[in-house]
């Protein structure tokens, strides 16, 4: 009796599995590239944030120092009077010095959080803390600049309605110093606005 033989056909290896694995690998690769790209952008923002804080520290310390040393004594005096002008003669200027000194101290304390944002660009907590604190501190800084600016304006122009005479014609150096301090603090306010925008952009990318 002849033995029947059975033949089993083995088809060609399917390419479906291979193509699927390639798709998965490509997707993972693209995802990794996207994450790395976002991380690089956030790190760049964090570095710019750190440098801007250093600049703001220099500006605020300079503004507080110039206002603190603003003082002038006129070369003439009477038997009972000596004509002198100083920052401590006006409460608005005293408030300016104290407030801007607080702002400068905060900026120094905020540097470690900025460094953490550079090392860990995807971390949300330090960036959120900086955003909240920057918003609060810029309010303090703006109030100090506004108070000092109003008194500086009166020193330059006076007020005819209240018979307040301008004093800057006599105390030129004093007015120059306080004006410089107000301008410097206004620049610091602009720095803070940029810092807040940077933090908002970094948080939006999460």
Swiss-Prot record:
Side Cytoplasmic, residues: 2-43, 117-127, 202-206
Gene Ontology biological process terms from the UniProt entry: cell wall modification; cell-cell junction assembly
Extracellular side: 65-95, 149-180
Key words, A-Z: Acetylation, Cell membrane, Cell wall biogenesis/degradation, Glycoprotein, Membrane, Transmembrane, Transmembrane helix
PANTHER family linked to this entry: CASP-LIKE PROTEIN (PTHR36488:SF11), CASP-LIKE PROTEIN 1U1 (PTHR36488)
Segments crossing the lipid bilayer: 44-64, 96-116, 128-148, 181-201
Phenotype upon loss of function: Disorganised deposition of Casparian strips.
Pfam families: CASP_dom (PF04535)
GO CC terms: Casparian strip; plasma membrane
Function, as annotated: Regulates membrane-cell wall junctions and localized cell wall deposition. Required for establishment of the Casparian strip membrane domain (CSD) and the subsequent formation of Casparian strips, a cell wall modification of the root endodermis that determines an apoplastic barrier between the intraorganismal apoplasm and the extraorganismal apoplasm and prevents lateral diffusion.
Result when mutating residue 170 to E: Normal subcellular localization
S-adenosyl-L-methionine in keyword set: no
Subunit structure: Homodimer and heterodimers with other CASP proteins. Interacts with CASP2, CASP3, CASP4 and CASP5.
Membrane topology category: Multi-pass membrane protein
Glycosylated residue positions: 159, 177
Protein family: Belongs to the Casparian strip membrane proteins (CASP) family.
Protein name: Casparian strip membrane protein 1
UniProt main location, coarse: membrane
Localization annotation: Cell membrane
GO terms, molecular function: protein homodimerization activity
N-acetylalanine: modified positions: 2
Taxonomic lineage: Eukaryota, Viridiplantae, Streptophyta, Embryophyta, Tracheophyta
